Amino acid sequence: MSTTVPPEIEEHTRTLRALLHRWGYAYYVLDAPEVSDAIYDQHYRELVDLESRYPELVSPDSPTRRVGERPASAFVSVTHRVPMFSLENAFSQAELEKWGERLLRAIGPGLEFICELKIDGSATALSYEDGVLVRGATRGDGVEGEEITQNLRTIRAIPLKLLGGEVPAVLEVRGEAFIPRDEFERINQERQAAGEKLFANPRNACAGTLRQLDSRVVASRRLGFFAYTAHYGRAESQWEALAELESHGFRVNPHRSLCRDLAEVRTFCEHWENHRHELPYDTDGVVVKVNAFDHQREVGFTSKFPRWAIAFKYPAEEKSTVVEAIAVQVGRTGALTPVAELQPVAVAGTTVSRATLHNQDRIESLDVRVGDTVIIRKAGEIIPEVVRVIGELRPPEAVPYVFPQTCPECGTAVVRAPGEAAVRCPNPRCPALIRGKLGHWCAALEIDGIGDKLIARLVSLGLVHTVADLYELSAEQLAGLERLGARSAAKIVEQLDRSHRQPWSRVLYGLGLRHIGASVSVELARAFASADALARADLAAIASLYGFGEELARSVVEWFAQAENRALLERLKAHGLQLAGGGRAAQSSALAGLTFVITGTLPTLSREECTALIESHGGKVTSSVSSRTSYVVAGEKAGSKLARAQDLKVAVLDEEQLRALIETREMP
């Protein structure tokens, strides 16, 4: 952690994560929301903002490391062939131009951008084999989603069989399902007549429709679909990929533009910011991408976002409301987070009743007081936040807010390190910290039945202090708790037993290592097939993984260096948790001990297929060329990585030579 990050901000960030994990688990997994969408979105935006301003705060357990909801138990969970990354957001033209200028410096002349409308719906993955739709799924957490093939077949804009004479053997299509505004109004009118709860907005209506168990309900609603990218196709640019999708019978949004500089990008964004309400569907921004795929490969990914794309969000809608109270919540890292409780107000389609105030500094800088009239804004038309106080409307009885000097959970005197913003509870046994860790574990391992209320009771009774303690609970102990009963207790014990079958990657995610989210945990588990192997790995070995870096690697190394964490692993192992498995099964060891970098466009293999080929024979693929690189596999339009390999005298192979190397284990 950088010393430049104020402690109060660090602590507040941890608090936000704990809240969002609990709320997200209740909403997406249990289908039993504890708070409104507006409250969740409000806190999520605050976390996005903090992690954007302080990249050091990005944590493996952060909800922003997810790219969507966890699959519900009513649907079959499927693994995406290609992970569905979320996009970094730009909330101003300045942020957008900063992103573009960074890419211009990295790539140089010839860089082109493509602008596409960001449809406000549900991201969807479609899999075609030999031109036939074989599977459709929700985005889920980006690695796994829910199979909803039957529901997606009812959407007329999705071809069941690809058009065109020449179709690829395998095609992965990504797109956005959505509900037009007029259809949204019709659906809500029907629900109102039937006495059912109304959908808050078209986006929520679309998500709820796609998760219907009865596909006849989906068919009765007029959903639309725009395809926006494809994998394993023949295109060499995003512009060509969209044309290829159209040739196969997909509906592609016609409002797109190929831009040769940032000025053209700005013009496109400004136009649709002013004219978006003329469209028959909702759009909450513009997606800007680097057009050429070789340029996309050159700049690569962060652990969560592609560096070559960004979502420009339209300026937010603002409303005024009154602060009725200011509550302070304690996160699992001990940070105290103040939250403004508001008179409910509708902002951009959802009802906002709570707004985060981030930290003590934020309250003091805004001078927010109970009774104040404040401006609420939904940044990107999704996430609400308090922008400012309307001082002229302040009631005479309003007094400055005094931040608590003791933890509201345990009474310990709070601390604030010099130069940091976070006010923290320093007590490692604070019930709030323990509850947060337990909640994250149960969400990560999909343990049903152990919600916030039960966790609070277990902690208050002293029955549970760590996640390992959960596995020492008996049905008799649980049944003795008020309002639980023998049947519920037995189900909880059964759920804990079932969590033993969760893979090593999910256990790793549940441990809550900093910067190691769900998708990163999958990659780590593939590269290091056991906790012991990961514990033995050094900084360089972890940092060399594709898409990783020193910051992620250091988080892993430091976590495994702590004795209490190693002791926790031993206890979990003794309880039967999966601390091994999940590595890619090797067809041979022909490439064992060799490290590869892939650059350019290969004749027959996509980058993903080439990576899988190398790893299936024991090799390792990294994203950057160094003196430790064994071979660079280069295709057409190979960029700076090829030049780097030549400078370092690293051997360069083409696709044919790579295959020969596998067969003979000798340089051809």
Curated annotation (Swiss-Prot):
Disulphide bonds in the chain: none
Top-level enzyme category: ligase
Domain BRCT, first and last residues per copy: 586-668
Keyword Transcription regulation annotated: no
GO terms for MF: DNA binding; DNA ligase (NAD+) activity; metal ion binding
Family to which this protein belongs: Belongs to the NAD-dependent DNA ligase family. LigA subfamily.
NCBIfam families documented for this protein: dnlj (TIGR00575), PRK07956.1 (NF005932)
Protein name (Swiss-Prot/TrEMBL): DNA ligase
